[in-house]
UniProtKB/Swiss-Prot annotation:
Pfam families: Serpin. It comes from Meriones unguiculatus. Glycans are attached at N59, N96, N260. Interacts with CELA2A. Interacts with ERGIC3 and LMAN1/ERGIC53. Interacts with PRSS1/Trypsin. This is Alpha-1-antitrypsin.
Length: 406
């Protein structure tokens, strides 16, 4: 397909993460464990790639995103791409196409999403994808079948000629899917947009061991050497999985949710954030998740709500994903009516971190602590946060808190 004009495709990946709900406590054991490992490993590589690009672009702003959400949207898009466009998308997701077949890649995503979407009364995790198609466009039936089978995606027809109405329809869908936490995801639509692909994740978690709101108090958070802000600081003394990692020059705190997810908070020593970002690998994450030990500690963690909105074209290009944005894109597997290119890709993520845990009416939990003086671990400087699925060890969300008040 050759043309000097390519019509626009809009890619939207939206995430809402209310930290302290998630996956089933015991995901069923299947023959997919090896497949899960491959998916988790590739997602981790992709996650760190995304994080480092954003960190390099600015070291003074918060970062929060879902590599799973972005990867799912790109994998869906690859179903309708061909030749070099397809290869770039899948290789950008760190798949070796000589070792893993395209069919296995999509089966891997299908299984992972099925695992994550398991119902759990204690936890809330919902992922989903939808296509918004111009009402004059005919989509390839095979593409529709495959995105439905592998990604449970629905297709909705809208009139992109009426950009305000189309924008309203998409934003209303995302707002409803994320329980009102992501609003106005689409600020504007390119005049040539004929297709929008939306992927979203809604996450609400409850700590296994919640903080007491009565103990939350105002404290200083040091954004940098010259900037200090006041934040509500959550406080708890008890048994924590916390240790000091010499390799990373950082304190590492693991906090479990009810269900099958863990948050990893990594607090570097003053002036060591760059060292942490250059040194941290997926192997560190696996080690933290596999070697669990608790000790008595005083932990102080800021209560916060941050968000990030990203132009994925700027983020994905350094990772080698470029052709899909160009007039040379081959997305003829989606439609043969008009030549398509990805005109805009937007990802929005929202993180809320608070004291909430189990609503245990009239129940008090007392923990025995050793007589030795416990370490005081205070997250009063910028830190990294990674939220993982314990079953697959997939990094579902990654971020950096530079300023909790922004």
């Amino acid at each position: 397909m050759t043309s000097s004009i390519s019509w626009g495709l809009l890619l939207l990946a939206g995430l809402c993460c209310l930290v302290p709900s998630f996956l089933a406590e015991d995901a069923e054991k299947t023959d997919s464990s090896h497949q899960d490992h491959i998916m988790a490993s590739n997602l981790a590589d992709f996650a760190f790639g995304l994080y480092r690009v954003l960190s390099h672009q600015s070291n003074t702003t918060n970062i929060f995103l879902s590599p799973l959400s972005i990867a799912t949207a790109l994998a869906m898009l690859s179903l309708g791409s061909k030749d070099d466009t397809k290869a770039q998308l899948l290789q950008g997701l760190h798949f070796n196409l000589t070792e893993t077949s395209e069919a296995d890649i999509h089966k891997g995503f299908q299984h992972l999403l099925k695992t994550l979407n398991r119902p759990d009364n204690e936890l809330q995790l919902t992922t989903g994808s939808s296509l918004f198609v111009n009402n004059s466009l005919n989509l390839v039936e095979k593409f529709l079948e495959e995105v439905k089978n592998h990604y449970h995606s629905e297709a909705f027809f809208v009139n992109f000629a009426d950009s305000e109405e189309a924008k309203k329809t998409i934003n209303s869908f995302v707002e409803k899917a994320t329980h009102g936490k992501i609003v106005d995801l689409v600020k504007d639509l390119e005049i040539d947009t004929v297709l929008a692909l939306v992927n979203y994740i809604f996450f609400r978690g409850k700590w296994e061991k919640p903080f007491d709101p009565e103990l939350t108090e105002e404290a200083d958070f040091h954004v940098d050497k010259s900037t200090t802000v006041k934040v509500p600081m959550m406080n708890r003394m008890g048994m924590f999985d916390v240790h000091y990692c010499d390799t990373l020059s950082s304190w590492v705190l693991l906090m479990d949710y009810l269900g099958n997810a863990t948050a990893i908070f990594i607090l570097p020593d003053e002036g060591k954030m760059q060292h942490l970002e250059q040194t941290l690998t997926k192997e560190h994450i696996y080690k933290f998740l596999q070697n669990r030990h608790t000790r008595s500690a005083n932990v102080h963690l800021p209560k916060l709500s941050i968000s990030g909105t990203y132009n994925l074209k700027k983020v994905l290009s350094p990772l080698g994903i470029t052709q899909v944005f160009s007039n040379g894109a081959d997305l003829s597997g989606i439609t043969t009516d008009v030549p398509l290119k990805l005109s805009k890709a937007v990802h929005k993520a929202v993180l809320t971190l608070d004291e909430r845990g189990t609503e245990a009416a009239g129940t008090t939990v007392l923990e025995a602590v050793p007589m030795s003086i416990p370490p005081d671990v205070c997250f009063k400087n910028p830190f990294v946060v990674i939220i993982c699925d314990k079953h697959t060890q997939s990094p579902l969300f990654v971020g950096k808190v530079v300023n909790p008040t922004q």
